[in-house]
A protein has these predicted regions:
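Asp-based, Mg2+/Mn2+-dependent phosphohydrolase catalytic module
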Residues: 213, 217-218, 223-253
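Active-site phosphate-binding/coordination module
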Residues: 23-117
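Short hydrophobic/aromatic-enriched beta-strand-loop microsegments
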Residues: 59-67, 80, 123, 166-167, ...
Length: 253
């Protein structure tokens, strides 16, 4: 039976500390496709960022933006942003002098903030950050991500109004979609798949929604404990050939 594999990127395909792709992981992806299986990413990264990874690993499909986008063979099937009414409520009800913000409004690693205070509070520079004084977020056609500079304790003061969130870093709460299973369902619909054909790999809390009982779920050894509890199989760490080990164990390669 042809299987359809969905891999998280960070901490699953990449090693947790160095963010490298182990040689065994690259070879496993190659062998899976050589055996006739379908391989896709399933990541919270924005579509353009995930596309770079897909090209490097020669993966033909990607569920990106936490399930808010699906791309197959270079064609974007859909790419949605966060619900704007909820974003507007968040902006209206939060003390932004205390918790500076930045938003991603384009399909690239780029974010806009209205104050220099954001870059003073956060350390990461993974996204290009432009400071536009007086920027009006309501002019954005789409908002893909909202970065909020705060600690875990301070995050209790932020009214999310049902918006999904993950921790980007210890100093940054990231508002982004966390329903990767939605993208998997879209691919299942496109190819008329059964639940028995789906295999998902992950390590983080934003992978929980795609660890469904009807699918084959593999957690990395370095994964979060709640995810491991949902998994049908726990493999070795990402930096200990965990992807290869699981695929060999089940005879997929």
């Amino acid at each position: 039976m042809r299987k359809y594999f969905f891999f998280d990127i960070d901490g699953t395909l990449t090693t947790p500390l160095t963010a490298d792709y182990p040689d065994s992981t690259r070879e496993t992806i190659r062998q899976l496709q050589a055996q006739g299986h379908f391989v896709s990413l399933a990541t919270g990264r924005i579509q353009a960022d995930a596309t770079e990874v897909a090209r490097e690993l020669e993966i033909p499909a990607l569920v990106s933006d936490g399930g808010n986008a699906v791309t197959v063979e270079g064609e974007i099937l859909y790419h949605e942003g966060l619900p704007l009414p909820l974003c507007y409520r968040l902006f209206a009800d939060t003390d932004w002098k205390k918790h500076p913000w930045a938003i991603t409004t384009e399909n690239r690693k780029y974010r806009i903030t209205s104050t220099a205070g954001y870059l003073e509070k956060v350390k990461d520079r993974y996204y290009e950050t432009e400071i536009i004084p007086g920027y009006d977020y309501r002019k954005a056609e789409k908002i893909y991500k909202i970065f909020i500079a705060c600690t875990r304790k301070e995050s209790e003061e932020i009214p999310l109004h049902g918006l999904p969130s993950v921790w980007f870093r210890e100093d940054t709460l990231l508002i982004e979609p966390v329903h990767k299973e939605r993208g998997i369902f879209e691919i299942m619909k496109k190819y008329h798949l059964t639940d028995e054909q789906i295999v998902v790999f992950g390590d983080g809390m934003n992978d929980c929604s795609m660890f469904r009982k009807e699918w084959m779920t593999v957690a990395m050894g370095n994964g979060k404990a709640p995810l491991k509890e949902k998994a049908k199989y726990i493999t070795k760490n990402a930096d200990e050939d965990g992807i290869y080990e699981a695929c060999r164990h089940f005879g997929w390669i």
